[in-house]
């Protein structure tokens, strides 16, 4: 019996000894060098990322290697000094509107709330949400629009409350007002901007506040208040905002129906800021102000001047269409067709505008019983603009081979 007891004791001692030896010589070695290995991994990834590879880098293979290396740091060494840095650096190499980037930023905020990158991460998610909402608004997609603005609002407010000393706090306060503006909650936006005026009196954001306030008053049709705000920005001499604010003044007159004052204001923009986009736009808006005054010759001359000087301006296509429409109203058929054809043939203009113009060439010929020319114009529409107009009910979408065949037969 004793032999069995002694044997059992020996087995237990052997197991205990083996367990202890394993702790000393096994996995414990990796923990013993945990922080050294973390330092080495961080040094290696920084060397790999020198010079820093950006999201738009053409070397996608290197970008993938750098991303993988940063992930290895925070996945393998989550308690190291470098884990939060690695998460932030990886998230920064992914599109800010990508859900993977959101997940990484949230991970940093939740796991490392005291990190120097925590406020940046919160701001990144908030601003990306705001940008998504703005893009949805541009495309006319209203679904989820308020949800993105609301998410941005909540995160901007959380950043302000959680990190009051952050360098991003001021920008976050400004952006809360911009979220209200984006949601068309104009009174809330105005109230927020009014709150910021005094504390931001020495901030670089002050003139942005004044400019957007002017835009809000313009939307609210409070034209005199809009001009006051725009004038304050112009007087500041801000190189970026002063031209825009100067353009906003005649815009308010145009909206108010004071077309002569608008003309004078646009001319002032051209004189003061000829090399800015506002200066370019003023040429076109002068043409539209002349049209409102029923000075059609002056309107056409001004619009043609704008097109000649700035053929790639975003207003050029609409100006050319405007010229065609004025000619059509004046029953100058040849001029109208020529103007519409110029739009249709200009590859720098957007597809739908060109398709619409080509349709009108055919339509004018058809309405004037010039069947052969109408057929040729419509065939050109089908060949050069095979995709339908984005507006499902647009008249150009009704033109097809059957339409042309019917036109041929009825025109004989």
Model-derived regions: residue spans:
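Acidic, polar-rich low-complexity tracts and alpha-helical solenoid repeat scaffolds
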Residues: 1-412
